Amino acid sequence: MSKFIEPSNEEIKLEKLYQDMGLSDKEYDKVVEILGREPNFTEVGIFSVMWSEHCSYKHSKPFLKQFPTTGEHVLMGPGEGAGVVDIGDNQAVVFKVESHNHPSAIEPYQGAATGVGGIIRDIVSIGARPINLLNSLRFGELTVKQNQRLLKGVVSGIGGYGNCIGIPTTAGEIEFDERYDGNPLVNAMCVGIIDHDMVQKGTAKGVGNSVIYVGLKTGRDGIHGATFASEELTEESESKRPSVQIGDPFVGKKLMEATLEAITFDELVGIQDMGAAGLTSSSSEMAAKGGSGLHLRLDQVPTREPGISPYEMMLSETQERMLLVVEKGTEQKFLDLFNKHELDSAVIGEVTDTDRFVLTYDDEVYADIPVQPLADEAPVYILEGEEKEYNTSKNDYSNIDVHDTFIKLLQHPTIASKHHLYEQYDQQVGANTIIKPGLQASVVRVEGTQKAIASTIDGEARYVFNQPYEGGKMVVAEAYRNLIAVGATPLAMTDCLNYGSPEKKEIYQQLIDSTKGMSEACKVLQTPVVSGNVSLYNETRGTSIFPTPVVGMVGLIEDVSYLKEFKPKAGDKIYLVGETRDDFGGSQLEKLLYGSVNHEFESIDLSDEVSKGKLIKQAIRNGIASHVQTVGKGGLLVTLAKISAHYDLGMQAQLDVTNAQLFSETQGRYIVVVKEGQTLDIDQAQEIGHLTHQQLFDISNSDVKMKENVSDIKQKWEGAIVQCLTTQD
């Protein structure tokens, strides 16, 4: 007789308790078909998390297959903990982005902190040492106190974990819109470096080999976290605080160092982080990839308190844990290592040749499931989409008050400086950060070499909402340009797809079209997708977030020498590269003046992005450019002001654009600051002005002449978010 009191198989079926765990009637019937019998309580729990949207991608898998995943530099693509890309000299960069949206909505500090911890372990499980962290965040409008609380909690959680574990946070983006009220987006990215011959895989093979658990003792925190992440947020979500995990960065640091030492042991067969769905996903996925069976003895699992049932053990998402498979007879070598690092560890099972996933507790069987169907036969749903109707009318931008519009855009929290927030992150730990958070992609030196890794994380929402296909292309191209702007060669990307409920036709169509656009851009820009994550059901009280694909992209700088002189000075000339058109659909200007973002915009020319990018990268590496900035949200005037304020330099420029075009967000444009005495010889390059010692932002077109003190601009730009957070409390 079981020592744990749980519903019987019959009760589960008759009362449809499986629905509370996330399985539909059809999915339950499929489980019965696979097992040839009714599942017990633990088995239902296991199937429910493995077949959740978060783990199985059952609504998005068809779209993910269209992404290019191979390329000249790709060593390992999707399917493992993170992607691996060659950077020469037998070295590789390892990277991935993950979402922690739902947990952060309920417990912002812990939700964000554990998101950072989880993505770090993904990188470490491949065998790489993390070199930097990035994040992409979305919140509702900052005039709402709840959004202020979420922002403060998330930023504190990111800084608290990253700073303690000793990994710099070097880049990110934060945007604000009412569509994220109650449903913030917290996407965390980690980048690491590894030698080719040290790359690990999450596989369980070799009959008789042992399974070792290491890390924090298992508790009841995070149970059904994967299922929670696959649901819409409702008023009842607050009651699911137990589904939010609790992080411990100090144990995380020990686990990271112990893992990086363990991968040097030849006797290590496979390793995987216990992330979403905890012990269930890590163990069953390792068995599936190894074509093996597993027998886990759950009475051997280290637990935080007595009485934790097999169901709770398998579904717990206690943080800071890894699962290893090691050669039989070498267990003590690994246990001694973990003991040295003051970590709990235990041998909890072995690899079998049965192709079954068997769980016992005190020799009583609590689950007996065929491995492959559990891991690989989750249902895939292809639904019906519905095209959105676009507003083809034209807004009137002929009577813009340039100065008033400029100040309002500069102070909008989405555009305003995030300096106050980023200063809570340790940006320099490890002493390899070359370019810190600010205007550009981050650059981190590869220790012991002249190489560096440039990384950026960029999301797009309004444009994807307006025209999903074009918006999908746009978000990939934006990341590409940000790497070009520091002289890096873009190599590959990771993505996080944040959308509402795919069961709503319009949102499903957004997913179809935007991923098609992203795929097209990846192919033309030669940036294959090597890892990623999908987060659906981002809705609060029936209102969906904007469709928000986020792209993390890495690039290689073979020799960082040119970066010593990559800083603008007075006397340097300013060039605008690219044509400025009347592109206002989806722009900050449209939102500011009309409160909506429902107008079409010009398509993006990907071939032009490639040719232009090569020329600008060459100008940077040849020492011609002292700074390059992509023209982004808010348009040309705002971009120029940010450069002036960031570097405390005056600027004088004459712009051949209309008043409205000062704020146009035409894609594919760069501001290139050229060193005094040099010339930028590039098609579409127009010299528009120069930098000055005089602290004056002096910009004009044929209609308006603007003169502002740089210090005033800087105060408005840097003080906007601080003012929101202090005056609204």
Swiss-Prot record:
It catalyses: N(2)-formyl-N(1)-(5-phospho-beta-D-ribosyl)glycinamide + L-glutamine + ATP + H2O = 2-formamido-N(1)-(5-O-phospho-beta-D-ribosyl)acetamidine + L-glutamate + ADP + phosphate + H(+). One of its GO terms (cellular component) is cytoplasm. InterPro entries: PRibForGlyAmidine_synth_PurL, PurL_linker, PurM-like_C_dom, PurM-like_C_sf, PurM-like_N, PurM-like_N_sf. Its main location: cytoplasm. Pathway: Purine metabolism; IMP biosynthesis via de novo pathway; 5-amino-1-(5-phospho-D-ribosyl)imidazole from N(2)-formyl-N(1)-(5-phospho-D-ribosyl)glycinamide: step 1/2. The keyword Nucleotide-binding applies. GO terms for biological process: 'de novo' IMP biosynthetic process. It is found in: Cytoplasm. The active site is at 54, 100 (proton acceptor). It is an enzyme of class 6 (ligase). ATP binds at residues 57, 96, 495, 532. Mg(2+) 2 binds at residues 122, 273. Mg(2+) 1 binds at residues 98, 533. CDD domains: PurL_repeat1, PurL_repeat2. PANTHER family: PHOSPHORIBOSYLFORMYLGLYCINAMIDINE SYNTHASE SUBUNIT PURL. This is Phosphoribosylformylglycinamidine synthase subunit PurL. The gene is purL.
